[in-house]
């Protein structure tokens, strides 16, 4: 066949009058347009256009197709798409050519844009709709169901979503994939709920529904009625269904709010509360087992159902989860006490309370949830130094240490809790009420009434602790009566009590979006003159917007447009709470705009910080978004950039984030370094030097910063807190803003946001305790007991091992003080030494060479030993129940126990219900290590976690209680 060098002959046929010749010309041009498009475009494009628009011409669609291909080769995609739509069926979506594939992507993008447009008058071209539907048909024919599902989700086509899942042939896999995509990619809350509704219906239509996934969808939909119905039906069936019901209960407690759990329990049949004769129990789990595990289930009958129902209620209340976590954290506590003692020693060398408070906070975080207060009891004299608000922080730290010890909370704090009226120790009493809130955070049914009672005592300092405690205990309950009680405290117009009341009102109404609360809080924020109160109300308003997404936009616009920078500050957190984890572009755009344009440093700092919340589900994107802001001339922006990285990349050990943070640790401004240290610890929490080499380096940097006399005090405070964060919960807890199933971790999000307010008020540091999640897998049998079982971790133990303990310093304290030498003595020694200098030079040189040789030999020996140890290290290890498993270790876990298998297909961190494969054999249970709770005397050093009577209180100390220092007189500052 002769090669064609030109299409001029075909183009000339377009001038003929006969339609057949014109049609023939277009057919030939269509076959070679990709090669001769430039010649066609330069001479005959207008002629082809006239044929395209002439509907009387039989080949007008072919003319449009030729034009589309010409414009495609000219890279004029809008015109190419326009004429492709006019080509009708000639634009064959089944074709695999580059032209078809490219325009299909363009058409799909345009279709998605039109489908998601907020303009109600938007009309979609029927030809465009036809092409996209053809694309869906092509996907179904080729078996590309996931591709069709992805396009359907982006285009918001619910009918195609349902069709893609139901026709896929692997419905369960597609349902899981759709749920994941829905949580990660769908920004519109209303549409996401519509998709979740379809998933629930498709799940329930299966022969064997996956009730675990169904309940996850129902939690997102806030449908407690359907959840209760499923639970009730499951506990009436066989043992397999019972285990599934218990597992669903544990997942509900982990992923839903207090109010949702209460609603579910109210829909279940009630159970009679049994009186407990035993009062000196251990954690909540022990008392629970005494009540409900007194015997095996009876076969059939109402007693068996009642026992199952009682256990289900205990799971939903949280007694089992909290008790098991307490047991795990207590028995596995691996806190390095040398670090704490070193910090305490260093704090004694510094004036002021900042380092002293930092050590208290670090100790609380290191022992969070472990119930171990050994460090406090062994340093009583040091604790006696605390006065006023430092004493408040010291007592409230017990709440972090004993987090979750709900059964014995009042006994633990009995020494400090207030009576019917205020005595001479309001700071201790207020701190104890705050501690109660920290112990009962998001689980405060038993303590709320007590805190309300103390809220009625007329004392501003007591109101502060009681308000914070009540807000934490009643978090997200949405109770109007508690809101009104706190509002009455707010209206006292006192800065101390108002600061706590504003935050507490937001915590109680967390995520409710209540219009009444918004109007009242915003109005009072504009009326009051107290900056503390305005700021706390702004944060409270942000709490109300938790998870509201687009519904929060009206309030957000109102807050960020306010003249008061304190309200704009709260507006940044309103964006963070409304869009946490969504990666929403509009939210990020607003935050970035404020970060570079607002005239107030605190607002800019908050805006940059809140980027971390929005990107918390996509940590890999945060370093890129923050990189330039971390180099800003404004130190407040750099501070915010550091915390944004810490929040978004918490527990990931991400190297890009660590590189930016490492550069910020050498910043010239103390508080920027403070943020960098803390954020570095957040990123490196639960990582080992084998997995992330920077983990070991970071610990050394923290220690160096603390011991360096020239280091800024704010930087040192950050390094102290960093040690507390990186070793949190006895090195058995991590920071997770989202659960593996995609749910937001409400406690963690609120905890970190509250913790960040330590910039203004140090006691808010304790909120970090809320953000900590135990990293454990705890297996339970049908009686909610821990059986002895093991599973395999298919990786080297060192990858996820505890960091080695630091060695105590052997340097004596006298070495720190140099002997004073007079100048004339130094001169005499210098003159006498010069004569012997030449002789000594050779000796010194020889000694130096010998020293270097020894150091080299020692280094080689260490390397050989390390290599030898690495060779001997096993490739896997067996883990025993309850086991420490960090999030990144889950992928290596294999459940291969001969007797017990998890009811879940892919168990996550937390409590796992176990199926007993040999139920007729006797079970061996794990022996509890937690000692009985008893009140200890001052001199008792038994090591029990409840010997709090030995902690400092104003009624037992020898130092007098000093009055609170008065406010300085007004003055004018002139440079």
UniProtKB/Swiss-Prot annotation:
Q: Among the entry's GO cellular component annotations, what is one? A: nucleus
Q: Where is the composition biased (Basic and acidic residues)?
A: 842-880, 926-935
Q: Where is this region: Disordered?
A: 272-303, 832-882, 922-975
Any keyword Zinc?
A: no
Enumerate the SUPFAM superfamilies for this protein: ARM repeat
Q: Enumerate composition-biased segments (Low complexity).
A: 944-961
Q: Name one GO biological process term.
A: proteasome-mediated ubiquitin-dependent protein catabolic process
What ranges cover the PC repeats? 393-426, 431-464, 465-499, 500-534, 536-569, 570-605, 606-638, 640-674, 675-715, 718-748
Q: Name one GO molecular function term.
A: endopeptidase activity
Highest rank taxon of the organism:
Eukaryota
Keyword Membrane listed: no
Keywords for this entry?
A: Proteasome, Repeat
Fetch the Gene3D superfamilies from UniProt. Leucine-rich Repeat Variant
Q: Which Pfam families match?
A: HEAT_2, PC_rep, RPN2_C, RPN2_N
InterPro entries with a match to the protein in the record: 26S_Psome_Rpn2, ARM-like, ARM-type_fold, Proteasome/cyclosome_rpt, PSMD1_RPN2_N, RPN2_C
The entry's family comment says: Belongs to the proteasome subunit S1 family.
Function of the protein: Acts as a regulatory subunit of the 26 proteasome which is involved in the ATP-dependent degradation of ubiquitinated proteins.
Entry protein name: 26S proteasome non-ATPase regulatory subunit 1
Instruction: Please give the organism.
Output: Dictyostelium discoideum (Social amoeba)
Gene from which the chain derives: psmD1
């Amino acid at each position: 066949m002769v090669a064609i060098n030109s299409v001029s002959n075909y183009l000339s046929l377009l001038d003929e009058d006969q339609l057949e010749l014109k049609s023939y010309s277009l057919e030939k041009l269509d076959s070679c347009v990709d090669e001769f498009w430039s010649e066609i475009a330069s001479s005959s494009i207008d002629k082809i256009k006239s044929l395209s628009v002439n509907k009387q011409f039989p080949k007008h669609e072919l003319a449009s197709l030729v034009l589309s291909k010409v414009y495609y080769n000219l890279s004029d995609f809008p015109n190419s798409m326009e004429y492709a739509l006019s080509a009708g069926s000639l634009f064959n979506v089944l074709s695999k050519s580059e032209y078809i594939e490219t325009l299909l992507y363009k058409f799909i993008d345009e279709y998605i844009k039109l489908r998601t447009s907020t303009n109600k008058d938007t009309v979609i071209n029927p030809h465009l709709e036809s092409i996209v539907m053809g694309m869906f048909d092509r996907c179904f024919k080729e078996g590309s169901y996931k591709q069709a599902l992805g396009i359907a989700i982006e285009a918001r086509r619910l009918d195609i979503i349902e069709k893609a899942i139901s026709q896929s042939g692997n419905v369960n896999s597609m349902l899981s994939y759709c749920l994941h995509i829905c949580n990660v990619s769908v920004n519109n809350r209303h549409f996401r709920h519509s998709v979740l509704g379809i998933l629930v219906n498709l799940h329930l239509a299966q022969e064997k529904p996956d009730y675990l996934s169904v309940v996850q969808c129902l939690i997102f939909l806030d449908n407690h009625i359907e959840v209760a119905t499923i639970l009730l039906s499951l506990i009436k069936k066989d043992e397999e269904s019972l285990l599934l019901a218990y597992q669903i209960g544990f997942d509900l407690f982990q992923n839903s709010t207090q109010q949702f759990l209460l609603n579910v329990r109210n829909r279940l049949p009630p159970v009679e509360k049994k009186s407990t004769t035993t009062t000196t129990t251990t954690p909540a789990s022990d008392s629970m087992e005494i009540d409900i595990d007194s015997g095996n289930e009876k076969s059939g009958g109402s007693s068996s159902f009642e026992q199952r129902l009682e256990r289900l209620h205990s799971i939903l209340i949280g007694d089992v989860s909290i008790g098991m976590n307490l047991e795990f954290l207590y028995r596995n506590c691996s806190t390095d006490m040398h670090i704490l003692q070193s910090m305490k020693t260093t704090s004694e060398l510094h004036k002021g309370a900042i380092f002293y408070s930092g050590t208290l906070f670090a100790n609380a975080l290191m022992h969070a949830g472990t119930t171990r207060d050994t460090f406090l009891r062994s340093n009583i004299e040091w604790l006696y130094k605390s006065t006023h608000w430092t004493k408040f922080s010291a007592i409230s730290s017990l709440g972090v240490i004993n987090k979750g010890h709900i059964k014995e909370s009042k006994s633990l704090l009995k020494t400090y809790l207030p009576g019917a009226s205020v005595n001479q120790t309001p700071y201790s009493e207020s701190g104890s009420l705050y501690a109660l809130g920290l112990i009962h955070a998001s689980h405060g049914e038993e303590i709320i009434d007590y805190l309300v009672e103390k809220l009625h005592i007329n004392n501003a300092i007591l109101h502060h602790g009681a308000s914070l405690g009540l807000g934490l205990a009643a978090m997200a309950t949405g109770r109007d009566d508690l809101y009104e009680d706190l509002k009455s405290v707010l209206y006292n117009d006192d800065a101390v009590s108002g600061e706590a009341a504003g935050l507490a009102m937001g915590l109680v109404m967390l995520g409710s979006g209540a219009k009444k609360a918004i109007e009242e809080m915003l109005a009072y924020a504009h009326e009051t003159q107290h900056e503390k109160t305005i700021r706390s109300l702004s944060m409270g308003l942000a709490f109300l917007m938790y998870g509201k997404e687009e519904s929060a936009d009206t309030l957000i616009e109102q807050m960020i447009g306010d003249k008061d920078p304190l309200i704009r500050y709260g507006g940044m957190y309103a964006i963070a709470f409304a869009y946490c984890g969504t990666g929403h572009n509009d939210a990020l755009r607003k935050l970035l705009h404020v970060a570079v344009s607002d005239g107030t440093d605190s607002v800019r700092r908050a805006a940059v910080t809140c980027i971390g919340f929005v990107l918390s589900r996509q940590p890999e994107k945060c370093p890129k978004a923050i990189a330039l802001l971390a180099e800003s001339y404004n130190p407040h922006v750099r501070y915010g950039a550091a915390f944004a990285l810490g929040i978004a990349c918490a527990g990931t050990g991400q190297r890009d984030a660590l590189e930016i943070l490492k550069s910020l640790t050498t910043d010239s401004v103390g508080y920027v370094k403070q943020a960098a240290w803390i954020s570095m610890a957040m990123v490196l929490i639960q990582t080992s030097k084998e997995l992330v080499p920077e983990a070991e380096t970071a610990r050394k940097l923290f220690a160096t910063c603390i011991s360096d006399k020239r280091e800024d005090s704010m930087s040192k405070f950050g390094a102290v807190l960093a040690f507390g964060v990186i070793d949190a919960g006895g090195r058995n807890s991590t920071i997770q803003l989202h659960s593996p199933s995609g749910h937001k971790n409400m406690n963690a999000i609120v905890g970190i946001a509250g913790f960040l307010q330590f910039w203004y008020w140090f006691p808010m540091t304790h909120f970090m305790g809320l953000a900590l999640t135990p990293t454990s897998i705890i297996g339970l049998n049908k009686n909610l007991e821990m059986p002895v079982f093991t599973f395999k971790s298919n990786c080297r133990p060192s990858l996820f091992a505890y960091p080695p303990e630091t060695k105590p310093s052997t340097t004596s304290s006298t070495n720190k003080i140099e002997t004073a030498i007079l100048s004339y003595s130094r001169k005499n020694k210098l003159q006498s030494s010069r004569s012997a200098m030449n002789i000594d030079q050779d000796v010194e040189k020889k000694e130096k060479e010998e020293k270097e040789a020894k150091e080299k030999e020692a280094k080689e020996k260490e390397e050989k030993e390390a290599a030898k140890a690495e060779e001997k290290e096993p490739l896997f290890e067996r883990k025993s129940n309850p086991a420490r498993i960090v999030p990144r270790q889950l992928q290596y876990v294999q459940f291969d126990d001969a007797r017990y298998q998890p009811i879940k297909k892919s168990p996550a961190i937390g409590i796992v219900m176990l199926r007993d494969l040999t139920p007729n054999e006797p079970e061996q249970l794990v022996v509890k290590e937690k000692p009985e709770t008893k009140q200890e005397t001052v001199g008792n050093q038994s090591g029990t976690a409840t010997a709090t009577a030995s902690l400092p209180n104003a009624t037992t100390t020898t130092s007098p209680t000093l009055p609170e220092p008065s406010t300085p007189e007004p003055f004018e500052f002139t440079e």
